[in-house]
Amino acid sequence: VTAFDICPHAVRCTLGNATVAGVQIDVRQGSWIAALRSAPFEVVVANPPYVPTPPEGENSLLSAGLGPWWAWNAGPDGRLVLEPLCASAANLLCGGGSLLLVQSGLAGVQQSLDSLRSTSLEAEVVASERIPFGPVLSERAGWLEQIGLVRRGCREEELVVIRADKP
């Protein structure tokens, strides 16, 4: 098992959890782009940033206790990381390999499916669940209403898991 995370705290946490569980894994600090250099993999599980982000100056100040901004901020449509990840996913996988990708319904699920399929991957939504807005989306709810991503008063989002298989 090889794990990549851009956040140093997450890397330390993963190493600690592996030690407690008595398993040996290779944990590296880096983005999915760094993972391309170690590819191909049989299974890739990805939870990239996917939260739509207001333009500079329109974003309310979020508590530092929520974690680093890069853990969720993903550009105005939520696809800043999703789009290049989906376009490169086939390069992360060996033949017969699978990608499991989690994202918000606010960040263009069909776009992800189309992008994955355009690289000859077989892609489908395999799980979805509606959940209440967490603190980040709650802070951005007014902006999300203004740009039409959520209807007025809506305070829940759909999270989906996409599976993409490489033949």
Q: Language model features by range: what are they?
A:
Residues 78-137:
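Conserved Class I SAM-dependent methyltransferase catalytic core
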Residues 33-44:
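A short acidic, Gly/Pro-enriched loop at the edge of an enzyme's catalytic core
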Residues 119-122, 138-167:
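Core SAM-dependent methyltransferase catalytic element
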Residues 14-15:
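Conserved SAM-binding loop
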Residues 7-9:
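Conserved SAM/SAH-binding beta-strand->alpha-helix loop
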Residues 1-5:
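Conserved SAM-binding motif I beta-strand of class I
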Residues 39, 48-81:
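Mobile active-site "lid"/loop adjacent to the S-adenosyl-L-methionine
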Residues 22-32:
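Conserved SAM-binding strand-loop segment of SAM-dependent methyltransferases
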